[in-house]
UniProtKB/Swiss-Prot annotation:
The gene is ATP13A3. Residues 1-28, 50-205, 254-409, 470-940, 984-999, 1095-1105, 1165-1226 are cytoplasmic. This is Polyamine-transporting ATPase 13A3. InterPro entries: ATPase_P-typ_cation-transptr_N, ATPase_P-typ_cyto_dom_N, ATPase_P-typ_P_site, ATPase_P-typ_TM_dom_sf, ATPase_P-typ_transduc_dom_A_sf, HAD-like_sf, HAD_sf, P-type_TPase_V. It is a multi-pass membrane protein. Belongs to the cation transport ATPase (P-type) (TC 3.A.3) family. Type V subfamily. It comes from Macaca fascicularis (Crab-eating macaque). It comes from the Eukaryota. Mg(2+) binds at D498, T500, D883. The lineage of its organism: Eukaryota, Metazoa, Chordata, Craniata, Vertebrata. The chain crosses the membrane at residues 206-226, 233-253, 410-430, 449-469, 941-961, 963-983, 1000-1020, 1074-1094, 1106-1126, 1144-1164.
Length: 1226
């Protein structure tokens, strides 16, 4: 096998990686060991930081199949390296490892073949992960996932559970009987312990890991260097600061580990009952569960310790831990195609597709429904970190790096500082050699330049603004689990919103119903709760077709179901465990009308009277429920009226879907027109259908019948019209975002015309804007995929800006040409099906549609995630605001995902708002902008601080002098740290503005700002340094120098002079040092004021009272000790006395410096706002962002947007680069 081979694991997935094989080389290891000794351990540190260097330095390439070590590199933009050691799992060591047991193979690496002759589904057994001769399996662990060697694909692959490649039929036929004890033990050997092990590292381990951070190693190097130069006080101060920083970091990291550990520990070890092949029930610990175990769900509920598919019974589950949605969800058993001859056929089981039948790890089972003697059973499909909760925990434990231009530019800037330090390093060596300085002193002073140029406090200073922003967000009810994303939120220029519960109220009000009789719509009716309708099929559907349940006596479930059930005023009763036990079958949920609604006599003949009627009692039992599926956009139930021989099937859902499943002759001919009339007004419309089932369908047959056998050939019954009002604050928030030039997009699962109406009503689409509906059709019957373009236009303005009023907002299709379209704004609207077709067959059109796509309706959860990715691909910074239930993927994928949830923190989203209002979005963007500008300010200040101090030291090195220990201490602690941590306290500006903050440090205006301030500070510092030498009283300073007495200004205490003789050898005390110290101290404060930006992104600096007080105090203190020297202060700071006239001269230099610095910085700001856009427009510079470049192209494209009533077809196969030929048919 080729030793230079490279393979890909997790291909096509988010964690796709390249893999290389290596074997340990003894001679390389010996050379590295020698290098470690020669470098005093530094080489070992370097190899610790760089895993790829470590592997390449100690190993040689080898075939992946036979290697001892694997080197992994992610294929994303970060190209991160990891290494892992190959381990061997010996199956022969297990007591059950007999030839017979070894022949029982795992289907697709996971499923046990319980038959003697494995089918095609079972062709991949355990042997594909092992070598047949020794029965040993080679594997490695990366990010808590085990990857086993697969002989079939000649690559490493992670061991899958029953969640992939297993059909629904196979679930029942091959796995529902349970495992033998031997096979259970065998699988446990492979899958390991079922736990999401979040081990809280020991303090010592965390300490070592933290201390070995390059930043602290550099600080350790600095402290050792300063100590050798007898800068003990400054070195001690840095040590104290580092200890405080390390302790604080350790506390924070350990606290996060403990919180995460406690979150997963709730279900880590519980006792569960499992069914074995011989039908015995065995009680085991949840940690011993393996895929294939049949778990018995207890009657009183439990916290799920794994992912399991329900095969018997019904469960009410709270999934708030995963989704943030507190509404209980009903889970039913997985459909069994093998027992239903009318089913459409078998399908592969998938936890996401079949999530209504899957119990997810960490969720709470509240109640169960069961048959006596037939317990509620679920088959374990995934364990440990493979579960849905395990994957979430992994995303927290091993987050992807934050790809943000600011951080990339910061590293480049640090490299620039290192280069500057290198110049100073060389200059110091040359200057010292020319002055015949001792070798030891040369080495110390040269290295000292490096420690000055790269400021040790930079990382802490950069995070200060984020920490303060996080605290401010917490005060307004926004919680964050990813603080680094706060800065990124400052760059958001597009926000996607879910509709229901986000833009609109959670609750829907029943506006009315419109029933159908004889395939014709009756007049709309407002009141459903009346005697005339109580026994109609329409009301029976409302009473039964829902997923409501009683929890602790309170009716709970989906808000939409609750509103419908409350509207009819019926009563729901559920059987108790005792009542169920008295029967040989599960007791159904029963609904019945209150007595006052039941008519005393037979209703009029024109009412629907298909239901069997009892004179005394009328109630309906819900026999079987097919829960709502967002993919299918419908739900259905099978019910029976008490005393009736036949059962009834009821269905409700999206009108278009329901109509397609009904007999065509029962659907009114004007169905589409009536539906559009309601949806264009912003109403949410739900259709109902019904049919009588055959009498041969018994109770038990219904429990095993497929969904498709029920949901067809229905009778269309009519429409329910729900009014979904906008939240009061929605229009104002969207208006604020529009004023700030932040695009808004609606992503909803609702009807498209309803979504367009709501978008107009809330101001997302202005009345004068055009709406283009893209209807994409997939290839069919040899015809290529195509897109039909329809134009919609609003004739009247919205009736009320804050609610979807009952007055009509009619929408008409525009068929005439729109010559003025280029002069108006336009928006694209499409549904989820069209979006998927366009992604697959019209990839060239996707960027164009993303530029103006505003309404995306009927979107499934995975389509929402794809939309976020498509928007990011054209360089938008995308925010997403949703309820956390169906938006988990999109919330995590967006640059800034914010979930509206009552929970303080949700793993579903980086940000969580306790206030269920989109007002959190502008608040988050404002704080993000403030934090971003703070980071820029702090970085610029720290860069200037290092350059100013670097130049001060370089100047003094030229006369073989330096800053004193306490001078360093005063500058770094009293000035720099105080200024950095107070200048970061500026709150966010009170409103969003159209201007956007810069995204990186490498920009013309920002670089000019920094370079101009560097030149100014160097210039004035040089002026003071060389001018002091020209003074008539100047002389080379020595302990007996007395320039002050020469001018009669001040008499120094002679004892003070005598005490300074011990410092002569360092030449700290001299006139140049004193001059440079005073001027540079003022310069730090000057650039702090110049760089402390206020509006439009932060409050003015004069409102930052801590900063103002700190700067004034420092100014007054430095000015006082400069103009009126205090002997004790001068002695500590090693300042010499200079004539009063020179002190005044230094003050003038400082004042002029301040004037020039602040004036130049203000000019740079004005130049950026006024001249830069003009310069860019004159130069016709190509925008960096793809969407801006695309917008320029489309302005001159005569074929875009598509003309009314045209069709775009995809011609030929999609090419490798994703392009396709487009033809437009008028």
């Amino acid at each position: 096998m080729d030793k230079e081979e490279r393979k890909i694991i997790n291909q096509g997935q988010e964690d796709e990686m390249e893999i290389y094989g290596y074997n340990l080389s003894r001679w390389k290891l010996a050379i590295v060991s020698l290098g470690v000794i020669c470098t005093g351990g530094f080489l070992l540190l370097l190899l610790y930081w760089m895993p790829e260097w470590r592997v390449k330095a100690t190993c040689v390439r080898a075939a992946i199949k036979d290697c001892d070590v694997v080197l992994l590199r992610t294929t994303d933009e970060f190209k991160m390296w990891f290494c892992a050691k190959i381990r061997v799992l010996s199956l022969e060591t297990h007591p059950i490892s007999s030839p017979k047991s070894m022949s029982n193979k795992l289907s697709n690496g996971h499923a046990v073949c319980l038959t003697e002759n494995p089918t095609g589904e079972n062709r991949h057994g355990i042997s594909k992960y092992s070598q047949a001769e020794s029965q040993q399996i080679r594997y490695f662990t990366h990010h808590s996932v085990k990857y086993f060697w697969n002989d079939t694909i000649h690559n490493f692959d992670f061991l899958k559970g029953l969640d992939e490649g297993v059909s629904c039929t196979s679930i029942y036929e091959k796995h529902s009987a349970g495992l033998t004890k031997g096979m259970h033990a065998y699988r446990k050997l492979l899958y390991g312990v079922n736990e999401i092990a979040v081990k809280v590292p020991s303090v010592f381990k965390l300490l070592i890991k933290e201390v070995l951070n390059p930043f602290y190693i550099f600080q350790l190097f600095s402290v050792i260097l300063w100590s050798t130069d007898e800068y003990y006080y400054y070195a001690l101060a840095i040590v104290v600061m580092s200890i405080v920083s390390i302790v604080s970091s350790l506390y924070s990291i350990r606290k996060q580990y403990v919180m995460l550990h406690d979150m997963v520990a709730t279900h880590s070890t519980v006792r569960v009952s499992v069914c074995r092949v011989n039908e015995e029930i065995e009680e085991i610990f949840s940690t011993d569960l393996v895929p294939g175990d049949v778990m018995v769900i207890p009657l009183n509920g439990t916290i799920m310790p794994c992912d399991a598919v329900l095969i018997n019974g019904t469960c009410i589950v709270n999934e708030s831990m995963l989704t943030g949605e507190s509404v209980p969800v009903t889970k039913t058993n997985l459909p069994n195609p093998s027992v239903d001859v009318k089913g459409i056929g078998d399908e592969l089981y998938n936890p996401e597709t079949h999530k209504r039948h899957t119990l997810f790890c960490g969720t709470t089972v509240i109640q169960t429904r069961f048959y006596t003697g037939e317990l509620v059973k679920a088959i374990v499909v995934r364990t440990g970190f493979s579960t849905s909760k395990g994957q979430l925990v992994r995303s927290i434990l091993y987050p992807k790096p934050t790809d943000f231009k600011l951080y990339r530019d910061a590293y480049l800037f640090l490299l620039c500082l290192v280069a500057v330090a290198g110049i100073g390093f060389i200059y110091t060596i040359i200057n010292s050699i020319l002055n015949e300085v001792q070798v030891g002193v040369i080495i110390i002073e040269s290295l000292d330049i490096i420690t000055i140029t790269v400021p040790p406090a930079l990382p802490a200073a950069m995070t200060a603004g984020i920490v303060y922003a996080q605290r401010r967000l917490k005060k307004i009810g926004i919680f964050c689990i990813s603080p680094q994303r706060i800065n990124i939120c400052g760059q958001l220029n597009l926000v996607c919103f879910d509709k229901t519960g986000t833009l609109t109220e959670d609750g829907l009000d029943l506006w009315g119903i419109q029933r159908v009789e004889n395939a014709r719509f009756l007049s709309p009716e407002e009141n459903v709760c009346n005697e005339m309708l109580v026994k109609s099929q329409f009301v029976a559907c409302l009473a039964t077709c829902h997923s409501l349940t009683k929890i602790e006596g309170v009716l709970s479930g989906d808000p939409l179901d609750l509103k419908m059930f409350e509207a009819i005023g019926w009563i729901l009763e559920e059987a108790t465990e005792e009542e169920t036990a008295l029967h040989n079958r599960i007791m159904p949920t029963v609904v019945r009308p209150p007595k006052q609604l039941l008519p005393e006599s037979t209703p009029a003949g024109n009412q629907e009277m298909e239901l069997f009627e009892l004179p005394a009692i009328y109630e309906i039992g819900i026999v079987r429920q097919f829960p709502f599926s967002s993919a299918l956009q419908r739900m259905s139930v099978v019910a029976r009226v008490l005393g009736d021989k036949k059962m009834d099937a009821y269905m409700k859902g999206a009108p278009e879907v329901i109509a397609s499943l009904c007999k065509p002759e029962t659907v009114p001919v004007d169905f589409q027109n009536v539906l559009e009339d309601f949806t264009k007004q912003g109403f949410r419309v739900i259709a109902l259908a019904h049919r009588k089932l055959e009498s041969k369908l018994t109770w038990h047959k219904v429990q095993n019948i497929s969904r498709d056998a029920i949901e067809n050939n229905m009778d269309f019954m009519g429409l329910i019209i729900m009014q979904n009002k906008l939240k009061q604050e929605t229009p104002a928030v969207l208006e604020d975002l529009h004023k700030a030039n932040i695009r808004t997009v609606m992503v909803t699962g609702d009807n498209m015309l309803t979504a367009v109406s709501v978008a107009r009503d809330c101001g997302m689409i202005l009345p004068q804007d055009k709406v283009i509906i893209a209807e994409a059709l997939p290839p069919k019957d040899g015809k290529v995929a195509k897109i039909n373009w329809h134009y919609a236009d609003s004739l009247t303005q919205c009736s009320h800006p804050s609610a979807i009023a009952s007055e009509a907002t009619p929408v008409k299709l525009v068929h005439d040409s729109l010559e003025d379209l280029q002069m108006t704004r336009y928006h694209f609207a499409m549904n989820g099906k069209s979006f998927s077709v366009i992604l697959e067959h019209f990839q060239d059109l996707v960027p164009k549609l993303m530029l103006h796509g505003t309404v995306f309706a009927r979107m499934a959860p995975d389509q929402k995630t794809q939309l976020i990715e498509a928007l990011q691909n054209v360089d938008y910074f995308v925010g997403m605001c949703g309820d956390g239930a169906n938006d988990c993927g999109a919330l995590k994928r967006a640059h800034g995902g914010i979930s509206l949830s009552e929970l303080e923190a949700s793993v579903a989203s980086p940000f969580t708002s306790k206030t269920p209002s989109i007002s959190c979005v502008p608040n988050l963007i404002r704080e993000g902008r403030a934090a971003l500008i703070t980071s820029f300010c702090v970085f610029k200040f720290m860069a200037l601080y290092s350059i100013i101090q670097y130049f001060s030291v370089t100047l003094l090195y030229s006369i073989l002098s330096n800053l004193g220990d306490f001078q360093f201490l005063f500058i770094d602690l009293a000035i720099i740290l105080v200024v950095v941590f107070t200048m970061s306290l500026n709150p966010a500006w009170k409103e969003l503005v159209a201007q956007r903050p810069p995204s990186g440090l490498i920009s013309g205006a920002l670089l000019f700002s920094v370079l101009s301030q560097i030149i100014i500070c160097i210039g004035f510092q040089s002026l003071g340094f060389f001018w002091v030498k020209q003074q008539p009283w100047y002389e080379v300073w020595h302990p007996k120098s007395d320039a002050c007495n020469a001018t009669g200004s001040l008499l120094w205490n002679s004892s003070h002079l005598d005490n300074e003789t011990e410092l002569d050898e360092h030449n700290i005390q001299n006139y140049e040092n004193t001059t440079v110290f005073f001027i540079s101290s003022f310069q730090y404060l000057i650039v702090a004021i110049a760089f402390s930006k206020g509006k439009p992104f932060r409050q003015p600096c004069y409102k930052n009272y801590f900063f103002v007080f700190s700067v004034i105090f420092l100014y007054v203190f430095i000015l006082f000790i400069m103009l009126y020297p205090v002997a004790s202060v001068d002695q500590v700071l090693q300042i010499v006395c200079v004539p009063y006239q020179w002190r005044v001269t230094m003050l003038i230099i400082v004042l002029v410096n301040a004037f020039v610095s602040i004036t130049v910085e203000e000019s740079v700001d004005r130049w950026r706002k006024c001249c830069l856009p003009w310069a860019l427009s004159c130069g016709k510079k190509i925008p960096k962002a793809k969407y801006m470049y695309l917008a320029q192209e489309l302005l001159v494209d005569p074929e875009w947007p598509p003309k009314p009533q045209t069709t775009t077809e995809a011609k030929g196969l999609v090419k490798e680069n994703g392009s396709c030929q487009i033809i437009t048919i008028t």
